Each structure stands twice: as C-alpha cells, then as structure tokens.
Amino acid sequence: MGKRKRTENIQKNYPSEELLIPAVALMIMLLLAWTWTIIVAKTGLSGAAYFFSVFHVILVVMVVLPYTLKSVIAIAVRKRAEQNQFRNAKCILNAGILISIIYSIITVSLLYIFSDSLLQSVLINQKSQLTLMILNTVILFYSIACTFMGYFEGLGGSFPLLLASITGHLVMTIATAIFTDLFMKQGEKAANVLRIQGTQYAYGAVGAAIGITAGIVIMCIAILVMYQFYSSYFRRLLKRDTSRRRTDTVDVVTRLIRQVLPIAGSYLMMLLYPVIDQTIFFRTMGSGQDAILMSYQWGAYDGLYGGVMFLPLLIALALASREREKISLAFRSGDYHEVRIKAHGMIRDNIIISLFFMVESALAVRLIRCGCIALILLSLSVLLLILLPAINMSIAALITGICALAANVLTAFLTIKVLSLGVYGAMISVIVFGLVYVLLGIMFLGRAVRGRIDLRKTFYCPFLSAAITGIAMLLLGLLFELFLPPILNVLATLVISFVIYFIALAKLDVISAYSVSRFPFGELLLRFGKMIGIFP
C-alpha cells in the first residue's frame, strides 16, 4: 500500500519545477565547473588540450542525436499520455532505445575505424588516442540515458531525472579528481623512465576521461534504477490505456528519425565550430611548433571554452529548453502575448548567466576578455537555437547554423593561417560565429512573427540592454580590480550592473511599473524604481 501511494504520481510531493530545475541546474553547473577546474589544475594546460580536443569530438556525437532524440521523445510521449495512449508511449520508448543502440554501434565503430585519421587531422597527436577510445564508450550509455530521460519527461517525472543527474555529476567530479591525480603521477614516472617529454599530460587526459566516463555510466545506471523503481506505476498506466489504436515500432522509428534530423542538424552546426577551429589550428601551426607548445597554447584557449563559455552555455540551453514546449503551444494557439512573456524570460535567463560568467572573464587575461563578447553572442545563439524550432522554423535554424559555421571557417582560416594570430584567431572566429548566428536568427524570427509580437520590446531592446550592461560590467570589473580583492570586485560589479540593466530595460520601455509589480520581489523593485526616478 505504501509503495502504491509512493508511485501514484511521479511528481507528487516533490518541490515545484519552477524552483527545482534552476536549483539543480546551478548545482550541476558548480559540479561541472569544479570538474573542469580539476582537469586544468591537475593536468596543466597541455593535458587539458589533450582532453578537450577529444571531448569536443565526442560532445558532437553525444548531443547531435541522443540529446535531440530526448526532446523529440518527450514531446511524443507527452502527447500520447494526454490521450491515455500509454501503450503507444511505451512503443515510443522502445523505438527510442532501438535508435539509440543502432546509432551508438555505428558511431562507436566509425570512431574506432577512423581514429587514426582523426589523430592526424583533428587531434593533437598519437597521445590523444587512448583518451579517444575511453570517451568513445560514453556514447552508448549517454544515448540510452537520454532515451529514458525523454520518456520520464513526457510522463511529467522530472524529479527522478534531476536526482540521477546530480548523482552522476557528483560521481564524475570525484572520479575525475581521483583518476586524474593517479594517472598524472603514473605519467610522471613513465616520462622519467622513457625520457619522453609530455607523457604525463597524456596520462592525465586519460585519467580525466575515465572520470567523465564513470559519471556518465553512473547517471545511466541511476536512471535505469529509477525506471525500475517506478515499474509498478508504469504498469498501472498501461492498464489505464483504453485506446485500441496500436502503433507499429518501425513506423515510430521512421517518424522519430524524420522529426530528429532537422533539429539534429541545427545542433550539429552549433557544435562543430570548436572541432573545425582546432583542426585548422593544429594543421596550420603544426609545421612550425612542437606538440608541447601547441598543446599549451590550445590548452589556454580550451580552458577558456570549457571553464568560462561551455558551462554557462550548457545551463542556458537547459533553462531555455524548459520553455520550448510552452512557446510552441502558445504560438500554435495564437497566444502571442504568452510567447512574448516566455521569450523575454528566456532572454533574461540567458543574459543573467552570461553576465555572471563575464565578470569572471573580465578578471583574467586578454584572451578571456575576448570571451566576454563571445559568451554574450553564443548565449543568444543558444536562445535562438531553441526558439526557432519551437515556432516550426527548424529549417531556418539549420540555414542559420550553416551560414554561421561557414563564416567561422572563413574567419578561422584568415586569422590563423593568413594573419598567424594563433589562438587569438580562434577566439575571433568564435565571435564571428556568434554574431552571424544572432543576426540571421533575428532576421528569420522577425519574418515569422512580424505584426504579431512586438519585436522591439521582446528582442531588440533586451539585446541592447544586455549589450549596455555587458560593456558596463567589463569597465567596472577593470576599474574595481585596481583597488578591490576579486570577491568584492565580483559582488560590487554584479550589484551595480543589475541596477544598470534594470534602468536600461525601464528606459527602453521593455518593463513598466505594472509588469515589475508582478516580478518576484516586485513591490521592492517597484519602490526602488520610483526612488531612482525611472517609474512615476
């Protein structure tokens, strides 16, 4: 009886998703930041380059189909659940598992077969091979985990997924710290015996790869355990299915693939630029520099991408994805006011994440200060990547990604090959990618919603407010670091920048006294706005 009550509803007695998802996202972000910091700190910039050059390749394979398939399965299962077609929902799960296994077998086999070609064209050198082989095994576990995550999301069970994600990332952080340290020590011994410079860095990258793999495997196991725990609940759902309609598994597989491909192509365009940039960098610079110096330079760039840019973009993607279905439903039903509210909220979340990480960037070297601009542009690109497919513009998102990637490749070739700017050329290429993506995305978005949504208040003015705030944060950070310690610098810059962002939104008529009163702590914000004279 107790178990029946416990499994009557997956979400029952759990905290609200509005509070739970951001809190868990923050915890995962901190764990990932800690993991990335451990990798860079224990392996050095050269070891980080060995690891991240492989990780970018595996990340493309992991996200393009498994992550996209998760979203498509969640939508399809939710529709069946609303119609009490739980057997068809289970059929979608089975089809997703089949697609995941086939995809994993194909991609893992291809990566094994073409590993030598990757080492000669994309990665640093042969020292990256073992790291590639270890991370390659992650694909199967991540694909299966994503399939079950989509099924849980479709049935409304976010809490088990969040618990499994926290468990997996916690194990990932601990395992990375242990194995990276262990393999670095073994690598130092091997380097002394073999007298081969740089061996310890390759060993450290292998240890980091084992830690990442352990975290993904544990997350997959935790999700399967959660599925087994709620098995009696799922069986009761099947008994409640009164529909006579049955869906053929082959037909479901075909329809899922047809829905996944345009979205997967959009994600592919967003993820390919780090791989292309590192390929151009290694092939261009390899003739004039040794592997250790190249790995050190690329490690500095990858440390920026992994620690300062990748994590906030990942969280921005998670928070923006949360609103995708609501925007899609509101757009189809003609509720453009709801679309505007949700889109504005997504912009706000992305900008807050970008600005928070930009403060850290402003305290570092010139390379990281360039990342301030790139992070804002890429964060808005992630927002458009979610918004365009949500309003049935997947092809526009794909075209936008192709054009942005082409601009990135051209810029990388000119800055790295012709102008010999090295890693600075790679960062300039990222800025160009984000700029082209944002401009084209806004153009397509404007055509889709022209006359139905106030684009000025929904997109243009928030972007302008964010740009004003970003410039102010950079200048404030540079000013305060002259006489304040880093922690006080961050706190002072955040507080003042929030005020600047608030004033900019009010002066550009994005927010009014009435809308502010509906915010969390709205009355306090309204009194503050009246005190500084921006509201009557």
What residue ranges belong to the model's regions?
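Transmembrane helical elements of multi-pass membrane transporters/channels
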Residues: 17-33, 37, 212-219, 223-227, ...
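Membrane-interface junctions at transmembrane-helix termini in multi-pass inner-membrane proteins
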Residues: 142-164, 373-403
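Membrane-interface helix-loop junctions in multi-pass transport and translocation proteins
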Residues: 159, 169-222, 395, 405-439, ...
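Helix-loop junctions and terminal segments of transmembrane helices
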Residues: 67-82, 313-335
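Signature of the first transmembrane helix
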Residues: 2, 10-71, 108, 139, ...
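N-terminal membrane topogenesis motif
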Residues: 1-34, 87, 91, 243-267, ...
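Membrane-proximal transmembrane or re-entrant/amphipathic helices at the cytosolic face
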Residues: 2, 477-536
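Interfacial segments at transmembrane-helix termini and the short loops linking adjacent helices
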Residues: 116-135, 352-376
